UniProtKB/Swiss-Prot annotation:
Organism (species): Oryza sativa subsp. japonica
Protein name as annotated: Polyamine oxidase 7
Pathway stated in the Swiss-Prot or TrEMBL entry: Amine and polyamine degradation; spermidine degradation; Amine and polyamine degradation; spermine degradation
Subcellular location: Secreted, Extracellular space, Apoplast
Cofactor note (record): Binds 1 FAD per subunit.
Keyword Secreted appears in the UniProt entry: yes
One annotated GO biological process: thermospermine catabolic process
Protein residues bound to FAD: 61, 69, 261, 454
Function recorded in the entry: Flavoenzyme involved in polyamine back-conversion. Catalyzes the oxidation of the secondary amino group of polyamines, such as spermine, spermidine and their acetyl derivatives. Substrate preference is spermine > spermidine > N(1)-acetylspermine > N(1)-acetylspermidine > norspermine > thermospermine. No activity detected when putrescine is used as substrate. May play a role in producing hydrogen peroxide for secondary wall thickening through lignin formation during anther development.
Known cofactor(s): FAD
Gene Ontology cellular component list: apoplast
Entry's family note: Belongs to the flavin monoamine oxidase family.
Amino acid sequence: MTKPTTMAIFLSIVLLSMAQLPSLVAGTGRPRVIIIGAGISGISAGKRLSEAGITDILILEATDHIGGRMHKQRFAGVNVEIGANWVEGVNGEKMNPIWPIVNSTLKLRNFLSDFDSLAQNVYKDGGLCDAAYVQKRIDLADEADKSGENLSATLHPSGRDDMSILSMQRLNNHLPNGPSSPVDMVVDYFTYDYEFAEPPRVTSLRNTVPLPTFTDFGDDNYFVADQRGYEAVVYYLAGQYLEADKSGNIVDARLQLNKVVREISYSSTGVTVKTEDNSTYQADYVMVSASLGVLQSDLIQFKPQLPSWKILAIYQFDMAVYTKIFVKFPKKFWPEGAGREFFLYASTRRGYYGVWQEFEKQYPDANVLLVTVTDEESRRIEQQPDSQTKAEIMEVVRSMFPDEDVPDATDILVPRWWSDRFFQGSFSNWPIGVSRYEHDQLRAPVGRVYFTGEHTSERYNGYVHGAYLAGIYA
């Protein structure tokens, strides 16, 4: 028997209260439900409520736009995605719910990412690494990962006897510190950190290997490179129940932008939400779709304080940092063509500007490269001037391509999700030591306060489809 979702229970409670107290909202302007945050999870939660007949809602969004971490920014003459970029998990037995919206309904430009030719595209200081050697190291890493899948399957589903991915690697290759050569480190980084934004030493084996996103929906990833932005998905969902103008901009009064929630008071009879501009809103229920990073900060105060079991659940889970740095050059000096989209830099310093992507197909003639960093490198880079980051990048690319005339970059874009008080990170990662029971507590309601967001998705935390489904099913 399938247990009911939090959203199903929530809908039942709200609908019952509407039947019993029909005059509570009528004529007062008081919404039945306040939703905090207009990312894809908050917007999809509003859509689900509206479909159930609960239309007296109010969405409070801290920024000046909807979409949350699905957000485009103008750079080098094109719109690039500074947050979510891929539809991850496509062409499997099940349909990723985001894919038909992207590919069929909105027809957003997207491109299948080719991760299969990495052995030919690993660079060290001085140029390319030997492809045959790199392939052997990749094969060994793949064997360890497969062993990890087998080991993960033997661990109790509750997660009570979990271990880190690094512990699994130690069991398989008997290296106390895991992969340690430059090539092994960058292959390991690409396999795990590039996916989870945190290293194997902190990431749960039982809850991430294999990843349900790919076992459920397929192994393919499609890179969205449409000038409307990946956020067009959120605007499409919002337009299903909120009034929009001819340009697709939401003009419905039930969506309030630039409303920074600072306090949520809750009792057995209702909730009161206060914002930074001294506005006060009352409702029967509140649904919080703020990021895990925000919940772990002091941006929003709960009165009374959340119970200890809830606080522990919030602080045990990880909010990771994933930074996509876009760099504009006056000309191309890097290889292009089939099998060249991604290339790696094998540094003696793990995670140091390791994963690169060129945009021959996505943004032709833009002369832009993307380099991704995560975790401590992300935090370090966010705190230094962009000029310093640019100088470090120039040193790396000239080291990788010593025989090329590498010009100075003309522009750089460094997103700062960790420093942004409205996000305080990029997406959640499941760390070692957090059981399924504790994750259930993370998404569980506290009285009239409900929670949604990608971090509340048991199978797909950290992903766009996880955020969407969390809003639908909460």
